[in-house]
A protein has these predicted regions:
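Nucleotide-sugar donor-binding/catalytic module of glycosyltransferases
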Residues: 1-151
Length: 151
């Protein structure tokens, strides 16, 4: 409720009574959403100061997917410095995956699987685009069902 009062985001939190597995958990999270965008945020991750305000500005551009970088922290919340582990080479940039040249350039800039949407808490997706994908149930159990939908 604190976030709802400060930002124009309909933030929802749900914890299932039993473990339904990662893939069904991701799918359930987006299905319960009612806003234009979904940020499936892991329970062991934290938002940095001003991240909601920053994303509120970025979402105004209307892109389908936003991939945020992350900070790695130890158990005492001290930043771990691993500059080689950024998702992508280069700064912020808009890529159109419907453009083959952009897609190839995007993949060539990926430093790790994080750039391929593996780290869920770094992904914000337009909910209607996610919902438009006909999901292949054979991806349940991979822990990467969301990557099928995003790519």
């Amino acid at each position: 409720n604190i976030w709802r009062d400060r930002f124009n985001f309909p933030i929802l939190y749900q914890r299932h009574n039993e473990n339904i597995g990662p893939d069904r958990n991701y799918l359930s999270a987006v299905n319960m959403g009612t806003g234009d965008y979904c940020w499936i945020f892991g329970s062991d991750d934290i938002l940095t100061k001003n991240s909601l305000a920053l994303m509120e500005d970025k979402l105004a551009a209307g892109s389908d997917i936003y991939l945020c970088d992350r900070r790695e922290l130890d158990i005492s919340m001290t930043k771990i410095s691993n500059p080689h582990r950024r998702w992508l080479n280069g700064g912020s940039r808009l890529f159109s995956f419907s453009n083959e040249a952009d897609l190839i350039e995007y993949f060539s800039k990926c430093n790790s699987v994080g750039g391929l949407f593996s780290y869920l808490s770094s992904i914000i997706v337009k909910r209607n685009k996610w919902s438009d994908v006909i999901f292949d149930e054979s991806y349940i159990g991979t822990a990467y069902a969301h990557v099928y939908i995003l790519l």
